[in-house]
Each structure stands twice: as C-alpha cells, then as structure tokens.
C-alpha cells in the first residue's frame, strides 16, 4: 500500500462531524480589508518558513528545501488581491493546498527553477513536484513553549490548591448550612472532588442570598468554580491544522502522492508531526480533550482549528535563536495606515535524528 492509499484509508475513520471528505469544501469569501495584526501574523509565518528552509539547507548534504506554497505580498484591499485570491481558490479545487516547502533529493533538484517555485503555475511543475520526498506546512506561534509550560504548571498547581482549600473550608465551616434537605446534595458533590475527578468536575453555583451565612458559602462555591475552570483550560501549546485545510491537504496528497507534514515553529523550539499521524489522532474520539481539541481560533480569523498537543510530535529543533524585528508603515487606499512587525534572521538548531526519523530518511543519506 503506497502513501496515498494509506491516507485514503485513514480518512474513512475521521468522524464526519469533524471533517466530511464526501462533501465539497465550503467556498471562502474574499477578504475585503487587512489589519495590522493579520499582516504581522503573515510576516511571522513567512519568517518561520524561512527559518526552517535555512536550517534544512544549511545542515543537509543530500537534500534541498524549496519554497512552494502559494503566497503573495498583496493583502486584502490592494489592487490585484481579488484576482490572486480567486486564482488561489481555483488551485485549491484543482490540485489541493500547496505545502509551504518541498524537500527534494539534490539529485532531483532543478537548479534552473531554483529555491522558489511558489510563483510557477502548478501545471508547469506537476512532474517535478511528484519527485519531492516531503511537503512541509509551516505554522508559527508567538510563544516560548518552555516558559509557557512552566507557567501552566504553576497555574495548575495554584488553582488546584485553591480548589481543595475551598472545598475543605466549606465542609469544615459550613456543614450546618449544607445539612438541609434542599442543600445536602452539595455535601455529596464536594466529597466526589478528587485529583482524579477535578479535570471533569462541574456544578452550578447555588445562588443563595437569603442570609449572611448562605451568602458566604455561596461566594466560596463561586471561588471553587473559578478555580476548577482555570484547571480545566487547555494547558498545552499546539500544532494547529485548520479544519478547512484537512480536505485540501488530502486533495494535494491525492494529486501528488507525496508525504505531508506540519512543522510548528515557536520562538524557542520547533515541533513536527505527519499528516498521517494527525488523521490517526483525530480519528480516535478517546484523544478528544486529551491530546487534541477543536476550537475557534481568534488569532486566525476565528477559523475552526484542530489543536494537537505539540509534544505529540517530534522536537525538530531543540533551540531557536530569536529573530530581529522592526515596525513597518504601510499606506493603504484612502490614506489608511497600517503598522505591522517584520522578522528577520534567527537560527533553528535542528535535532537531525528526529528530522530524519519524521521524514523517513536514513542517516547515511542526509
């Protein structure tokens, strides 16, 4: 069974409530206006792509990373953007979504096309693309993952202590208030709160206000509710494939039969995961809420995004030197000004063993 056949079989296991491969993709509306935040995110994504490209090309003797993903410096509201965007939508339906990078063996690398084939019409490079050994979609995240995880551990510990201290205070000081037929169920409820159940624990705050003692215990239940909500928040940073992209990535694999991967670039590390593993993870409902969640991403135009725990993937770079950055002024139509941030430089220190493993490259070859 070749790569495409394996992926096709995996798509049959993905819940249709998440991705229905039998239905055509939803048509996208052309954006009408860009924002400073959108352009900054785009610049950050371009930097992350360049970071991975340079890291591979500077460390590999036998492989080359080539820019491939459809992109343009135009943004919504500028002349020519509507045409670019509609051409992009047509290409999505024709060949699928180009990954940002292609990895070629140097023996297959076309020096006349060079390191950037992103502007070449797809029908002119079909056979060339099929020679690639991998396609990589590069995602970026404006976090330091190590510091984030440290902060989440501190947060979880703090609110766990608050939750159990509050529970104990209620049971120790307000048992007389709760020992009433209409309120005794809260005693049973509090006794079921343990380290094992706190991640799924939920209750409705009573709303008692008829006397001072009831108001006091009601406020303690409010504090307990807040602490539990904090504990139950997602506490990991993610590899972030958009739900709308799953179909068009599959279409690209169907067209070219080239293995596809997602690399998530943080400002201190890079993690990678295969599209094959993504489909395997989201096909298992037992993983939902444990190693992945499905959320509306406010940082990405509120698009529905699959958020997979980064630690599920491979650490591709164990360290990243941060880029330099500067503010840019951009004048739009009618004199509207946008100010955004650009990123330059930086270095990703690759874990070559993990990179070879995820891409399926023998050590002697790399």
UniProtKB/Swiss-Prot annotation:
Task: Give one Pfam family.
Answer: RE_AccI
Is Nuclease a UniProt keyword of this protein? yes
Q: What is its EC number?
A: 3.1.21.4
Ordered alphabetically, the record's keywords are:
Endonuclease, Hydrolase, Nuclease, Restriction system
Superkingdom per UniProt: Bacteria
- Segment forming the signal sequence: none
Describe the reaction catalysed, as an equation: Endonucleolytic cleavage of DNA to give specific double-stranded fragments with terminal 5'-phosphates
State the Gene Ontology terms under molecular function: type II site-specific deoxyribonuclease activity
Biological process per Gene Ontology, one example term = DNA restriction-modification system
Q: List the disulfide bonds.
A: none
Q: How does it assemble?
A: Homotetramer.
Q: Any idea what this protein is called?
A: Type II restriction enzyme AccI
The scientific name of the source species is Acinetobacter calcoaceticus
């Amino acid at each position: 069974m070749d790569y495409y056949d394996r992926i096709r079989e995996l798509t049959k296991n993905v819940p249709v409530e998440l991705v229905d491969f039998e239905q055509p993709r939803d048509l996208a509306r052309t954006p009408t206006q860009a924002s400073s935040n959108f352009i900054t995110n785009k610049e950050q994504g371009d930097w992350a792509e360049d970071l991975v490209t340079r890291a591979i090309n500077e460390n590999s003797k036998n492989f080359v990373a080539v820019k491939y993903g459809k992109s343009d410096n135009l943004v919504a509201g500028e002349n020519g953007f509507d045409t670019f965007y509609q051409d992009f939508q047509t290409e999505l339906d024709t060949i699928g979504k180009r990954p940002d990078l292609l990895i070629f063996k140097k023996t297959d690398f076309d020096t006349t096309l060079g390191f950037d084939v992103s502007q070449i019409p797809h029908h002119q490079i079909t056979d060339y693309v099929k020679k690639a050994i991998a396609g990589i979609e590069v995602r970026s995240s404006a976090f330091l993952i190590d510091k984030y995880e440290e902060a989440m551990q501190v947060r979880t510990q703090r609110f766990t202590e608050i939750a159990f201290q509050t529970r104990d205070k209620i049971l120790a000081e307000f048992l007389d208030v709760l020992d009433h037929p209409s309120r005794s169920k809260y005693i049973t409820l509090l006794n079921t709160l343990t380290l094992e159940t706190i991640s799924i624990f939920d209750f409705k705050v009573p709303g008692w206000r008829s006397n001072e003692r009831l108001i006091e215990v009601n406020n303690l239940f409010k504090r307990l509710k807040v602490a539990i909500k904090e504990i139950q928040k997602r506490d990991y940073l993610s590899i972030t494939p958009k739900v709308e992209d799953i179909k068009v990535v599959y279409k690209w694999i169907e067209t070219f039969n080239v293995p596809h991967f997602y690399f998530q670039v943080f400002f201190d590390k890079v993690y990678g995961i295969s599209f094959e593993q993504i489909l395997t993870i989201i096909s298992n409902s037992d993983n939902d809420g444990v190693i992945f969640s499905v959320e509306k991403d406010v940082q990405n135009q509120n698009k529905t995004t699959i958020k997979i725990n980064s630690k599920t993937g491979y650490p591709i770079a164990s360290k990243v030197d941060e880029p330099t950055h500067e503010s840019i002024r951009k004048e739009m139509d009618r004199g509207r000004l946008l100010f955004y941030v650009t990123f330059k430089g930086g270095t990703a220190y690759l874990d070559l063993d993990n990179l070879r493993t995820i891409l399926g490259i023998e050590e002697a070859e790399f």
